[in-house]
Regions:
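Gly/Ser/Thr/Ala-enriched C-terminal appendages of enzymes
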Residues: 1-133
């Protein structure tokens, strides 16, 4: 773990998964969630998210879809990734931008887009920080 006086610069070590969370009501992305690699987000259960820098700020979400964002490039030393064309990359980027709320995309006073840690990953990070004191 890299420790810094600036909390934003403290690393979050571990093998991780990243999920993008979408509201089933309107299809918009409302947060990204970083988990330990062996965690699974159960879309059938309420999901509590919290701000890793202000842990008292918590919200419970239901009726959502979680999409895993990271894709394997190599497995067992073999390349398993087919690189998309520039047009496919452009289309994907446009699609992801369109899935954001207008309030997040605006230039003046944009709303924050939340990237949260799972409770398990946050606990592991805190444990490592305590060991370094």
């Amino acid at each position: 773990i890299k420790i810094s006086e600036n909390p934003a610069k403290v690393t979050t070590p571990h093998f991780k998964k990243v999920y993008r969370l979408f509201s089933n009501t309107d299809g918009k992305a409302f947060a990204d969630l970083i988990t330990v690699h062996d965690e699974v987000v159960d879309e059938n259960k309420p999901l509590e998210l919290f701000d890793p820098d202000a842990t008292w700020k918590r919200n419970v979400f239901t009726d959502f879809t979680a999409k895993e964002l990271l894709v394997p490039i190599f497995q067992g030393g073999k390349l398993v990734y087919k690189q998309p064309s520039m047009e496919e990359i452009r289309a994907y980027c446009k699609e992801q931008i369109d899935l954001q709320w207008d309030e997040v995309k605006r230039f003046e006073n944009p709303h924050n887009y939340y990237v949260d840690l799972s409770q398990k990953l946050w606990d592991l990070k805190q444990e490592l920080l305590k060991k370094q004191r």
